[in-house]
């Protein structure tokens, strides 16, 4: 299995709809990638002004192909991935501000 640090620019006008989709649980049950995608997006952070970052587990070649087709390309632009070890991405970005606001 492979893990990636994902960076992307959210389409601001669509973020409320994405949050509602996450809250509905529909992304979580998408097969085979729903659990990983839901966790990644739900815990995404702000890397810089207007750039989101999260770690994602994926098996596709190219990386995130199914996730992009089903969800990501509708809500994000300029998506980039960097291979990381499991948990390395989260450790690196954990101190950053969550895109959905802190509890």
PLM features: what roles do these ranges have?
Residues 1-70, 90-103:
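Short S/T/G/P-rich N-terminal loop/turn motif that feeds into the first structured element of a domain
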């Amino acid at each position: 299995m492979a893990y990636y640090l994902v960076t992307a620019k959210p389409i601001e006008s669509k973020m409320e709809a994405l949050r509602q989709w996450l809250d509905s649980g529909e992304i979580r049950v998408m097969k085979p990638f729903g659990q990983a995608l839901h966790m990644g997006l739900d815990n995404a952070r702000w890397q810089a002004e207007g750039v989101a970052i999260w770690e994602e587990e994926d098996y596709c070649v190219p990386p995130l192909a199914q996730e992009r087709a089903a969800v990501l390309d509708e809500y994000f632009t300029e998506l980039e991935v960097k291979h990381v070890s499991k948990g390395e991405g989260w450790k690196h970005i954990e101190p950053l501000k969550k895109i959905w606001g802190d509890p």
